[in-house]
Amino acid sequence: MDCKVEIIPRLLHFRQPAGTSRGIYTTRKVWYLHLTSPDFPGRVGIGECAPLPALSCDDLPDYEVILAKACRRLEERQGRLDVDSLCDYPSILFGLETAIRHFFAGSWALCDTAFSRGEAGIPINGLIWMGDFDKMLSQIEKKMEAGFRCIKLKIGAITVSYTHV
């Protein structure tokens, strides 16, 4: 299939600062992939590449160059994804796989689930961002009330006294 991938960079702003062991995020750069084909006029596939700065293995200085090459390779291979060449770049592989899957689904919904309809979340891990003790405790309580059975704490360098636990 003849195809074209447009890369659309965006800078997202967190609603509240997100603390990690590597610093505090207030913004995050992402790249949206817009897949089209003259063989299927009007059909699109959207993917997202979003490595976390200082945390993702593919957060590299030349990320945009690698992403552009991966997109050109997909075009050259007529929409066939070269998974082996992208093993070291999981965020790029995810973005391209998602764009391709979305394209061939022929609809804005990747699959019809309560999650994709925005009716429910996926309570796998309730992530608690770093903050002071009271803020983190409040987040824990909210996650437990929301039904999370596994809670992941991002405590980094924060000292938590055993009297608090």
Residue ranges and their predicted role:
Residues M1-S161:
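N-terminal capping/lid subdomain adjacent to the active-site entrance of alpha/beta enzymes
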